[in-house]
Amino acid sequence: MTPQRIGFVASPAPVAQEALVAMEARYGQCPLPEAEVIVALGGDGFMLQTLHETQSLDIPVYGMNRGTVGFLMNGYAGDGLRERLAEAEEEILNPLVMTAVTEAGEVFHRIAINEVSLLRAGPQAAWLKISVDGKVRMEELVCDGALVCTPAGSTAYNYSAHGPILPIGADVLALTAIAPFRPRRWRGALLPKTATVRFDVIDARKRPVMADADGRSVRDVVSVEVRSEPAIRHRLLFDPGHGLEERLIREQFV
């Protein structure tokens, strides 16, 4: 079915704003809650922002690249948008839920589509204890940080930290160390998608750590739990033959 009600959103970048004006003039603008499809104009960062902001609407999002990276985006073209939307293939992403507790006892809940990362917030290395499903798996990881990522997020920070690229349909999460010092050769682990990962910060006052969920940070954490949330669905649309599975494969041969 060819969608008629399209809601456009765009990043503040001039090139994205220019595209927004052109698209609205050509296809009209529908309020997002009433739209059949949301079209996001920008880069991957703006796509993540759009998915977070429209999470409660359960409306598919089609990205058009007006940014830098565009891994989650389709190519930009002014012509034939309705036809592209009618032929687009849908991918379902389940995000991560982060529960972070600070030294002051505050509890923060965050959603992450790509990854949850812990990073040292001072000059000294972070010391982390890692548990999986309530069982301690590593008493002490000395590192710059660690992260847990989804398959969709495995080509982002995880890949830069030498973590594995995960097939989009894989029911696994990647746990990846960031610049590990001890154990020196430990890079991480592949875990079931149902796993709950807990990080406890050792000597948090001397070695402060921050937690980050898709760019939203919590400082001075003492513990962080991360798990996948199957009840939350993000719906992404891609042009045929250019879905996330193909992109993940392609990234490994660049």
From Swiss-Prot:
Required cofactor names: a divalent metal cation
Function (record text): Involved in the regulation of the intracellular balance of NAD and NADP, and is a key enzyme in the biosynthesis of NADP. Catalyzes specifically the phosphorylation on 2'-hydroxyl of the adenosine moiety of NAD to yield NADP.
Sites where the protein binds NAD(+): 44-45, 114-115, 144, 152, 155-160, 179
Residues passing through the membrane, by range: none
Protein's UniProt name: NAD kinase
Family: Belongs to the NAD kinase family.
Reactions mediated catalytically: NAD(+) + ATP = ADP + NADP(+) + H(+)
Compartmental location: Cytoplasm
Annotated Gene Ontology cellular component terms: cytoplasm
Source organism: Cereibacter sphaeroides (strain ATCC 17025 / ATH 2.4.3) (Rhodobacter sphaeroides)
Domain of life: Bacteria
GO biological process: NAD metabolic process; NADP biosynthetic process
